[in-house]
Amino acid sequence: MPSVIFGLLALAIGLLGLTAWWWSVTEFLRGAVPVALIIFGLVALAAGVQSVRVPPAGKRANSDPNIDG
């Protein structure tokens, strides 16, 4: 029960602060969103590059001899 009360109190104070300092919040978001997009883009690029990489020479993609094909 105390966690519910604390959560509601924190939510109320957060909403009050959001409305009181709205322009500061938008200023922060204007700076944080491009940085977050760059970071997420780099992570997506790294994941894509890893999935496209060619296996080293001498190793086949399907090394199971029981696969017909």
UniProtKB/Swiss-Prot annotation:
Reported phenotype of the disruption mutant: No magnetic response, fewer, smaller magnetosomes which do not contain magnetite. MamC localizes at mid cell in a short chain. Magnetosome vesicles are approximately wild-type in size, shape and chain-like alignment, but there are many fewer vesicles, only a few have crystals. Deletion of approximately 80 kb of DNA, including this operon, leads to cells that are non-magnetic, lack internal membrane systems, grow poorly, have reduced mobility and take-up and accumulate iron poorly.
Keywords: Biomineralization, Iron, Magnetosome, Membrane, Metal-binding, Transmembrane, Transmembrane helix
Source species: Magnetospirillum gryphiswaldense (strain DSM 6361 / JCM 21280 / NBRC 15271 / MSR-1)
GO cellular component terms, semicolon-separated: magnetosome membrane
Name of this protein: Magnetosome protein MamI
Intervals, Cytoplasmic compartment: 1-2, 53-69
Top-rank taxon: Bacteria
The keyword Lipid biosynthesis belongs to this UniProt entry's keyword annotation: no
Function: May be involved in an early stage of magnetosome nucleation. Not essential for formation of magnetosome membrane vesicles, it is probably functionally redundant with other proteins. May bind magnetite. One of 7 genes (mamLQBIEMO) able to induce magnetosome membrane biogenesis; coexpression of mamLQRBIEMO in a deletion of the 17 gene mamAB operon restores magnetosome vesicle formation but not magnetite biosynthesis.
Protein's membrane topology: Multi-pass membrane protein
Induction of the gene: Part of the probable 17 gene mamAB operon.
Additional note from the record: This bacteria makes up to 60 cubo-octahedral magnetosomes of about 45 nm in diameter which contain membrane-bound crystals of magnetite (Fe(3)O(4)).
Lineage, opening ranks: Bacteria, Pseudomonadati, Pseudomonadota, Alphaproteobacteria, Rhodospirillales
Record-annotated membrane-spanning stretches: 3-23, 32-52
The family this protein is said to belong to: Belongs to the magnetosome MamI protein family.
Side of membrane Lumenal, spans: 24-31
Molecular function terms from GO: metal ion binding
Localization terms from the record: Magnetosome membrane
Main location: membrane
